[in-house]
Every structure is written in structure tokens, then in C-alpha cells.
Amino acid sequence: MLRIATGVRAARLWSALVGLASLLALGGQASAQTEQQDVVNAAETTFSNFMRDPDMTWLQRHLSSAKAVLIAPQVVKAGWILGGSGGRAVLFARNEQTGRWEGPAFYNLATASVGFQAGIAVSETVTLVTTEKGLNSLLATSAKLGGDASIAAGPVGAGANADITTDFVAFSRSKGIYGGVNLDGTVISVADGWNHAYYGRPVLPTDILLTAHAHNPQADRLAEALSRAASTNTSMR
């Protein structure tokens, strides 16, 4: 009975978390396309914040060699004994021939946890996808970080320098009562409905990220910011 009750509580908590994350991330907008563009615009702000942060030099130096970058402008983490986190993210993949960043493909992030925890935190995260295995895992319907692909927290500090061989390297900035988001164990799933709404037709992540058969000019500014940052920071490595 205790196990059943705990499961029910976890399900209810997770439903509340997802609802809270959606409200925060979407800003209560009624238009689906406006909702997606809001996330793209917020992702651009997040990316700019990380590129200006003197503690994110490892991220800045290694952006140019990444296969892709996953930007989550708002990940909500909350809990009381049972907890979890959730949010929306956009993924851009780097075309190795042209250097252009193709995207965005929209994804959902979800994590559940059990253990002593209390409070709420809101984070913005930028995750480098450093291997083909990591990128391929995101082209599937869903992937579990730390399971289907390896992940490490990125080095932070003005002089941070480390050799990391995981498929994903995650960086986060948080504000809240307790610690920031740990993406290990996070399930990343393709937001098919959001991709459909943003591009006006059913599309797969491969259509958006690899073949460039889907394009929305409203995301060009973020794609260009990625290209500029990667080009500018190549000499830092």
C-alpha cells in the first residue's frame, strides 16, 4: 500500500511539475506558433548569456567542435521528498561542410527523483553534443542521458580546462532554494507537435537538423549567433 501511495504521489507531483514548467516556459500564450517562437527567442537570450559569462570559457572554446547544441532556456526543478524537473529545449546541429547551424528541433525534458529535497529552482542550460552517438540518440523518439548516451557536467571557471569524452557536456545557471539541475537521468523526447506547428507540416528531427528540408526564417538570428560564436571562439582552443 505504501508503494502504491508513493507512486500516486509521484505521478501527481510530476503532473504538477509539467504544468508549472509549461506555464513558465510558454508564458501563457494562446498561439502555438507564438509559443514556439517565445522559446526560440528565450533560447537566444540564454545562449547570449552563456557566451558572455567569463566562467563558461570551456563551453565557449569547444562550441566550434560540437556536433550539436541543446539550449533549454527554462528548466523548472521542484520537490518535497519526491521531485523532478521539466522544460522545453531547442536543438541545433552543425553542418560540418558549411559551418551553418541547422534548426531548431523542439524537445521536451523530464526527470523524476526520490530523496530528500525541498524547494524550487529555475535553470537555464546549454548542453554540447560532442559525439555522433550523442546526436544520433536525439534523432530517435527519446533518449535518456546517462543511459542511452553519457553525460558530464561541464567545467566552470575562467581557466577551466579538462579533457571530457562523454557524449554530452552540460552547463547550467540556476536560481532557487536548492541546487541547480543535474541532467543525468533526464529523458529527452522529440516534441513532434511543436515541430509540426513551427514548420507548418509534420517533420522529423532529421528533416530539420540534417537535410535542411524544414526551415523557419524566424530562427535565423539564433542560428547566426551560433555560427558567429563558434567562429569567434575557434582561436581560443
Regions found by a protein language model. Name each.
Residues 1-10:
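N-terminal secretory signal peptides that target proteins for export/translocation
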Residues 9-11, 19, 41, 47:
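N-terminal non-cleavable signal-anchor helices
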Residues 10-13, 74:
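Hydrophobic alpha-helical segments, especially transmembrane helices
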Residues 14-25:
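Bacterial N-terminal signal peptides
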Residues 26-32:
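Sec/Tat signal peptide C-region and signal peptidase I cleavage site
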Residues 33-237:
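Small-residue-enriched, tightly packed secondary-structure blocks
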